[in-house]
């Protein structure tokens, strides 16, 4: 069990060594989601991993049939996603993660996470999958990878009614130094810290 909200016995350096120079993907005209998608395209093109964004479910309300052989959707709306944003395979491991962004400087609102998403993450972790969240603080230009186990335990403390302090994220997560190719090199952290390092040994405990 982790001490909450931000008590740890020692300071741990959890910064990705990708680059000592911070690169802001926003300066390249990219949103956080676009940067993740761009990174996934890079991984796919270079035969590193196959990771895709899950389609948002759509509820069709009304359909017109201007011709017998054609159907035209005239009214529909997006439904709330039931799981997480991304999934795929990396080095024979199932990868599943959610991505969240905030303009706040000191915390990540837990209202951004829904109970069914937390439950999905629990199931992925239980089955041995690699599950995490990518958290981007746009004002600070900082991005972190937080293992799902820490998110789940924090969520269970107050059932998502509060915010997760940035101090907590910095202590239990891993900062991602932005790159150029890929824009968000999150898989290096996954490989180093979740597939072979000390963090992975306790990942599913």
Swiss-Prot record:
Its EC number is 3.1.21.10. It catalyses: Endonucleolytic cleavage at a junction such as a reciprocal single-stranded crossover between two homologous DNA duplexes (Holliday junction). GO terms for biological process: chromosome segregation; DNA recombination; DNA repair. Mg(2+) binds at residues 83, 85, 98, 117. GO terms for cellular component: cytoplasm. Its main location: cytoplasm. Keywords: Cytoplasm, DNA damage, DNA recombination, DNA repair, Endonuclease, Hydrolase, Magnesium, Metal-binding, Nuclease. The record marks 100 as: Transition state stabilizer. InterPro entries: Resolv_RecU, Restrct_endonuc-II-like, tRNA_endonuc-like_dom_sf. It is an enzyme of class 3 (hydrolase). It is found in: Cytoplasm. GO terms for molecular function: endonuclease activity; magnesium ion binding; nucleic acid binding. Binds 1 Mg(2+) ion per subunit. The keyword Protein biosynthesis does not apply. Its cofactor is Mg(2+). NCBIfam families: PRK02234.1-1, PRK02234.1-5, recU. Endonuclease that resolves Holliday junction intermediates in genetic recombination. Cleaves mobile four-strand junctions by introducing symmetrical nicks in paired strands. Promotes annealing of linear ssDNA with homologous dsDNA. Required for DNA repair, homologous recombination and chromosome segregation. Belongs to the RecU family. HAMAP family: RecU. This is Holliday junction resolvase RecU. The lineage of its organism: Bacteria, Bacillati, Bacillota, Bacilli, Lactobacillales.
């Amino acid at each position: 069990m982790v001490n909450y909200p931000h008590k740890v016995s020692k300071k741990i350096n959890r910064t990705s060594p990708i680059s000592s120079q911070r690169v802001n993907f926003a300066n390249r005209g990219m949103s956080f989601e676009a940067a993740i998608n761009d990174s996934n395209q890079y991984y796919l093109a270079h035969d590193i991993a196959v990771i895709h964004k899950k389609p948002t479910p759509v509820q069709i309300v009304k359909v017109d049939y201007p011709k017998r052989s054609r159907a035209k959707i005239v009214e529909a709306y997006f439904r709330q996603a039931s799981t997480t944003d991304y999934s795929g395979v990396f080095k024979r491991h199932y990868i599943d993660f959610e991505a969240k962004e905030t303009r706040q400087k000191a915390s990540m609102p837990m209202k951004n996470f829904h109970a069914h998403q937390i439950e999905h993450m629990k199931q992925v972790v239980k089955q041995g999958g690699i599950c995490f969240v990518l958290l981007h603080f746009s004002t600070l230009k900082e991005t972190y990878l937080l293992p799902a186990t820490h998110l789940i335990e924090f969520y269970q403390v107050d059932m998502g009614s509060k915010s997760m302090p940035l101090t907590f994220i910095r202590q239990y997560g891993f900062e991602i130094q932005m790159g150029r190719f890929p824009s968000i090199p999150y898989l290096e952290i996954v490989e180093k810290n979740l597939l072979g390092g000390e963090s992975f040994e306790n990942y599913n405990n």
